[in-house]
Amino acid sequence: MSTVTHPDTELHVHLEGSLEPELLCRLDPALTLAEARAFYEFGDFAGFIEGFKNAVRRLQQPEHYRLAATALFDSLAAQGVVYAEVIFSAGVVLWKGQDLDEVWAALREAAAEAPLRVRWNADVIRRFGAEPAEQVAAWAVRRASEGIVSFGIGGDETSCPAAEFTRAVAIAREAGLKFTPHAGETSTAENIREMVELGADRIGHGIRAVNDPELLALLRDRAIPLEVCPTSNVRTGAVPSLAAHPLRALYDAGVTVTLNSDDPAIFQCTLATEFAAARALGFDDRELAAIAENARRCAFDYGFQRAR
């Protein structure tokens, strides 16, 4: 394995969380830069959700999505990222009454011109419930040949039981899509276990697994990776400080961990800052290289893996 620690693979980055304040103002000329920056000033998870919503509200037409995607891709490429799996809130597009196919066409246009390889995770909001999740899963299956590799569930983990999404997950997985839910970010380890039982291929965040030795062993033995986002966890209050982050304990337990930026504009972070955070937690070059390699190995685009 290379000892180079430069990360080049991003597996957990939200399109809607990548809108810099300057871009928000471009999308909404009535918005001042000070107002846009204030959206991203918060101290807890509820405040983060409000900031995310304020960004989403500015995405009013397909062209806005194309501009957002292009800006994200250019930023990732400038960091040296060559492959990204981008989460976009397809469920929110439907909730806003927008034409999902038109938005998707704009995103595909941006991806076709991107200076890196892009694949997509079609995400739904947990509190919206089962029916829209099933609609998105069926839509994602129809678009799988166009770059969608996974189906995800995000949002408030306590808002709707995991079992409600059994059919949506089955629709996606039976057609060959992977399942990448958020779990164990702000709730309990039990939520991770429920998503594993639903068939999760990777877990977004998953840091609460550290509280359950049996779950740690399950994740390790089934080789289910965690998409860990340290800066995000600190900013949302999921952990009280970087020093208290369980990344080291997860890694030492043999769980496959990757590092990711999550919502880079909202949290003002990059993939590189997440590796710097890991170094601050005591990870050395060899361990950082292993984590970078985990992301490449856990990418859902197997053609990308073979090309490495």
Could you say what each language-model-derived stretch is?
Residues 1-177, 187-191, 197, 201-202, ...:
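Metal-cofactor-binding active-site regions of metalloenzymes
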Residues 184:
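Acidic/histidine-rich helix-loop elements
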Residues 179-181:
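Conserved hydrophobic beta-strand within the GNAT/NAT acetyltransferase core sheet
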